[in-house]
Amino acid sequence: NNGEIYAMANSTSYNLESPRDDKNLLKKYSQSQVNKMSEKEKTKAFNEIWKNPIVSNAFEPGSTYKPFTVAAGLEEGILKGNETYYCDGYQKVGPHTIHCSHRSGHGLITLSQSISLSCNDALMQIAAKEGKNVFARYQKNFNFGNKTGIDLPGEAQTASLLHDAKDMTAADLATSSFGQSFNCSMIQMGSAFCSLINGGNYYKPHVVKQLRSSNGEVVSNIEPTLVKQTISKETSDKLRKYMKETVDSGTGTKAKMKDYTAGGKTGTAQKIPRSAGTYIVSFCGFAPVENPQVLVYVVIDEIQRDSQTNTGLAVEIAKKVLEGSLKELNVAKSSKK
């Protein structure tokens, strides 16, 4: 509701007191690899481990993007909320056969189930009905392709990593509907997702809340910056309901909590080259559903091969962070589950 970022973390760490110590490189490289590095190569290696991937890296978001596709349809009146779709496991798009993750098909499903069950087939049908102009306009409306303006250096440039409407093919539209064939950063997704669930308010993300002098006196407070309205409150309310269904009975059931209602969207994106069979799995979760106070976004890059398409670990991590955060912030428990 204000763009504040409480915490960021990633698996690559280094000693902040001695950032140029070669020992820091051993968390990513072997000793023999470090010994063979030239000074130029070592500088490049240090820059890689110092980089904040949440802000600086871009990747295909996968199914965490699906609520945005649905949001565009609801906001434009193309969708009413009572639609049903038949998933037979794939869509033929020109010469291409594009599969749903559920290869045998979900059968007849509702609009809310297109999100809660994460159905690619239904999302392709929705995007086709919207058309490429509406789809591309809402991508930009949610600020994908633009920098968020976060108060940290090295934010990724992603303007060239989205399809323009004029260049978007039918296959591009189909795959973009479920978060593939374009890239974004975690901070872009997190900021946009907040506007999906908070009534449509897109805030500039920031990590600094307050500036203080050397003796501890407050010099200035960083006030929230409302950038734009992305969708209506009515559309936002519907999406929260759909994403609660994801946790209650869909792909995100491992995020269920004892004391709070929760919602969210799981994501699986196959990395390029597709033939390598490697995936990014993720979960964007929030709580409580009736008045979201915390959003947690977890991304696991190239999870162990035996669980490549299993988003469960990302969901479990997000649940733990949500529970701890809600307790730390003294958020009132949900009255209704």
Where are these regions (language model features)?
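Short alpha-helix boundary/capping segments
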Residues: 231, 306-317
